[in-house]
Amino acid sequence: MKKIDVKILDPRVGKEFPLPTYATSGSAGLDLRACLDDAVELAPGDTTLVPTGLAIHIADPSLAAMMLPRSGLGHKHGIVLGNLVGLIDSDYQGQLMISVWNRGQDSFTIQPGERIAQIIFVPVVQAEFNLVEDFDATDRGEGGFGHSGRQ
């Protein structure tokens, strides 16, 4: 298992609010909690930035982190990330902030310590562009959206 440096920015993390952990041995994501003093009500269509009380420094350029919505909140309540996916670069060292968007029809209240997003760590390949005049031909060519059909 890869070690990632984590700094606790709020003294409640690790005490009142548990540190992120994998729920099962097969879990890909670690749940992130809302490090709030008071509940926040999010009206339909509204967004807000929610602190996690944690900062990370991945330090390895072959890794990045992605913050993703929790499936139950998205499906049942319309609570997703305002930027859809949060990308955390390996050299970032600041607090993890979660952009929360209520795309649902009803107001939603975020409680202090509530699990509102998840973070996963993914491999990264930094590419260098090779400028060309033309590409070698493929069967697909420039076929884009919907090109391969639905069935």
Curated annotation (Swiss-Prot):
The keyword Metal-binding applies. Keywords: Hydrolase, Magnesium, Metal-binding, Nucleotide metabolism. It comes from the Bacteria. GO terms for molecular function: dUTP diphosphatase activity; magnesium ion binding. Transmembrane segments: none annotated. Pfam families: dUTPase (PF00692). Substrate binds at R70, S71, G72, N83, L87, I88, D89, M97. The keyword 4Fe-4S does not apply. SUPFAM superfamilies: dUTPase-like. InterPro entries: dUTPase, dUTPase-like, dUTPase-like_sf, dUTPase_trimeric. Pathway: Pyrimidine metabolism; dUMP biosynthesis; dUMP from dCTP (dUTP route): step 2/2. Belongs to the dUTPase family. Homotrimer. This is Deoxyuridine 5'-triphosphate nucleotidohydrolase. The gene is dut.
